[in-house]
Amino acid sequence: MVILGIDPGLARVGYGLIEVNNQRQVKMLDCGIIKTNKNQYEGERMVEIAKDLRVLIRKWKPGLAAVEKFFFYKSSTTISVVQARGVLIMTLARFKVPIVEFPPMQIKLAVAGSGHAKKDEVLEAVMRELRLKVPPRPDDAADALAIALTGLFQQ
């Protein structure tokens, strides 16, 4: 089964795709970011996110999507990120991709063994689990792989 991990954002959406076989062996298929143009109107940026996510869904046909659950912080970008997350959830639902959601502490706990793990500890755990020699970049893509692994581990 293919699992798509998503780290929501407006400027950059991290994505990570992993595949697990019947023997529960896991490998990375792809990872990267959906980047939007900060000079565009928010609505146009949302359209770009949905369009690029559709391309990923059609190419990889994920059987599950794992999405980081957003918590409110006092920030001017909060509303925009929540809206972008809504676009992501809607697009996944339109393609009938089952969705699971995890808060950051649960992702850290599932992947690195501690809900308070530091970013580099999570990255090391992702690299170990996926047998990667080079760290996935950018950070949003690495985070998305951790989210995808959490989707696998929580099944």
From Swiss-Prot:
Binds 2 Mg(2+) ion per subunit. Its cofactor is Mg(2+). Its main location: cytoplasm. GO terms for molecular function: crossover junction DNA endonuclease activity; DNA binding; magnesium ion binding. One of its GO terms (biological process) is DNA repair. Its EC number is 3.1.21.10. It is an enzyme of class 3 (hydrolase). It comes from the Bacteria. SUPFAM superfamilies: Ribonuclease H-like. One of its GO terms (cellular component) is Holliday junction resolvase complex. Pfam families: RuvC. Keywords: Cytoplasm, DNA damage, DNA recombination, DNA repair, DNA-binding, Endonuclease, Hydrolase, Magnesium, Metal-binding, Nuclease. It is found in: Cytoplasm. Mg(2+) 1 binds at residues 7, 140. Mg(2+) 2 binds at residue 68. The RuvA-RuvB-RuvC complex processes Holliday junction (HJ) DNA during genetic recombination and DNA repair. Endonuclease that resolves HJ intermediates. Cleaves cruciform DNA by making single-stranded nicks across the HJ at symmetrical positions within the homologous arms, yielding a 5'-phosphate and a 3'-hydroxyl group; requires a central core of homology in the junction. The consensus cleavage sequence is 5'-(A/T)TT(C/G)-3'. Cleavage occurs on the 3'-side of the TT dinucleotide at the point of strand exchange. Belongs to the RuvC family. Homodimer which binds Holliday junction (HJ) DNA. The HJ becomes 2-fold symmetrical on binding to RuvC with unstacked arms; it has a different conformation from HJ DNA in complex with RuvA. In the full resolvosome a probable DNA-RuvA(4)-RuvB(12)-RuvC(2) complex forms which resolves the HJ. This is Crossover junction endodeoxyribonuclease RuvC. The gene is ruvC.
